[in-house]
């Protein structure tokens, strides 16, 4: 950490590479997802310590349903394990919210997520936004449909943020993708309209505190102009 560092308020991470990480070790993809799950609490805790206000994690996309049933079933069990760690998040004053569809998720999975949200609702520190069965285009479609149905007309562009499922966290400042790929994959497309993008080859289970520090340092060096120009 340097004196000139600017800490991004909202950091979003695409948790990519669990399966490839496991394959390198001769393990199943579920083994990789378990390792990725274990990494979440560590990075969330450190992000909170660094002063980040909101951390959004892409845990399960609307497209991930196309994966093999065995893998999907395992991914559906992960939020149940999140519930078991609610004490950790409460101790660190981290508030957990969930963004994404709720209608396709198994009841025991949804109950576990709702319990975790309820257990941490009094926390006043960093918001940990678990994006589960989330897709930005789907979220935008639902938002537009709701606005039309309610006869709501937006007076300015920024007003759209308050109607998205990610409303509590708002625009993204820094978006990180692990695993070497360089695309957004339908993640927070509106919220990340002016985000700084940071790609790292490391797979998510290997991502550590130093990697987050490096991403923040790189963010601090970026000149965010939002389409304007700097004063001469």
What are the residue ranges of the model-derived segments?
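Flexible, compositionally biased loop and terminal segments
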Residues: 1-232
